[in-house]
């Protein structure tokens, strides 16, 4: 989570959408360390700024407002991603980055745990602009310009903090038909409201 008091916007950070990379880019290029706030990430070495001890990582809207009531007057945005793609990203992150699941756990076994990055409860109360990960860079150019600064796409691409964690194969190749439906049910709101579909390339 990042609050720019200097530019009056809030980024509600969701999982598996490049949120830590975006935080790090903003901190390095468009951040006032004296007044802006960020929960940071110990996993990705993104620094923490100007928040109470224990305020880390992914934070929901009501907690953000309690910490800084001024945010109700700010622009608010978040990022979402195709749920089926997002779950594949979570699987490789848990298995290969932080060791939360065994190395020999298959993707289908992981899907059946339903330990998914469902994040809408973090942001819906804030009524944010929801940027789709699939065209995030173009949308961030427009959003940042509206906030008074330029988003440098090429520079941002150098901040890919979790690159190399997953195979380059299309996400659909990981799925069985049963897996598809489990994820569809878990992300029903995102699929219906953000118009996501399972793109089958199996």
For each feature predicted by the language model, list its residue ranges.
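Membrane-interface amphipathic segments in extracytoplasmic regions
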Residues: 1-202
């Amino acid at each position: 989570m990042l609050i720019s008091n200097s530019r009056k916007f809030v980024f509600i950070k969701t999982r598996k959408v490049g949120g830590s990379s975006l935080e790090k880019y903003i901190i390095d290029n468009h951040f006032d360390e004296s007044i802006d706030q960020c929960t940071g990430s110990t996993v990705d070495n993104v620094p923490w700024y100007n928040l109470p001890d224990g305020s880390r990582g992914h934070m929901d809207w009501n907690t953000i407002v309690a910490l800084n009531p001024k945010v109700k007057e700010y622009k608010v945005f978040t990022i979402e991603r195709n749920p089926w793609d997002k779950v594949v990203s979570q699987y490789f992150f848990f298995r290969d980055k932080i060791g939360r699941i065994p190395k020999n756990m298959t993707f289908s076994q992981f899907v059946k745990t339903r330990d998914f990055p469902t994040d809408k409860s973090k942001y819906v109360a804030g009524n944010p602009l929801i940027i789709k990960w699939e065209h995030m860079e173009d949308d961030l150019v427009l959003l940042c310009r509206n906030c008074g600064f330029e988003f440098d796409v090429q520079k941002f691409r150098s901040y890919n903090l979790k690159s190399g964690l997953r195979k380059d194969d299309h996400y659909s190749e990981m799925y069985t038909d049963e897996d598809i439906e489990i994820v569809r049910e878990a992300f029903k709101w995102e699929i219906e409201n953000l118009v996501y579909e399972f793109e089958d390339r199996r």
